[in-house]
Design a protein with these regions (language model features):
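Non-catalytic, glycine-rich low-complexity segments
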Residues: 1-38, 97-155
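Aromatic-rich carbohydrate-binding modules that target alpha-glucans
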Residues: 23, 33-80, 86-103, 139, ...
């Protein structure tokens, strides 16, 4: 594990969280890393796809690798099946203990291509509105909203909402 990069994530100073978060091949296994500040427990839950011959997959508990809420698990798989996180939070003064299920935005590749970026930089991308902003879509069976903004001088950009308790440390976006 790359501790300087983990610190960049926990301090919200990382300009490419996809480089660390989500699934990454490690030999014949996959290292899955996630950041959920304040969570006590995170489990990888395999979605059932209904494919013929699909093997039964056991949920994988993730290890709390950093007390700031950084979790990791080494999964015995050369390729990741569709999954989601089950995140458990303990009781605090503000709220009772609860759990939530959420997808992993970091398992998806950017929807803005190098060609899009080159055309935009040259001032000839006449349909950039199709790429920037908020766009509901489905990627690899995950339904959600894709976000992209042009913020060349921003130190960090995050997507926030009630789905992440308006916490800007979560759902950090990558600089393209």
């Amino acid at each position: 594990m790359n501790w300087p990069q983990i610190e960049e994530i926990t301090y919200s100073e990382c300009d490419n969280p996809h480089k660390l978060l989500g699934p990454h091949k490690q030999g014949s296994k996959m290292l899955v890393q996630a950041y959920f500040p304040g969570a006590e427990k995170v489990t990888i839950h395999w979605k059932k796809t209904g494919q013929v011959g699909e093997a039964f997959l056991t949920d994988v508990p993730m290890e709390l690798a950093d007390e700031e809420g950084y979790f990791a698990a080494l999964v015995n798989a050369g390729k990741m099946s569709p999954y989601e996180y089950v995140v458990e939070y303990g009781k605090t003064k503000e709220h009772a203990a609860y759990r939530k299920i959420c997808g992993d935005a970091y398992r998806h590749v950017p929807q803005i291509t190098k060609e899009d970026m080159d055309r935009f930089a040259a001032g000839i991308h006449y349909t950039i509105y199709e790429k920037l902003g908020a766009h509901p879509m489905e990627l690899d069976g995950d339904a959600g909203t894709y976000f992209a903004v042009w913020a060349p001088n921003a130190m960090r950009v995050s997507v926030v909402g009630d789905f992440n308790e308006w916490d800007g440390r979560m759902h950090q976006m990558r600089r393209l």
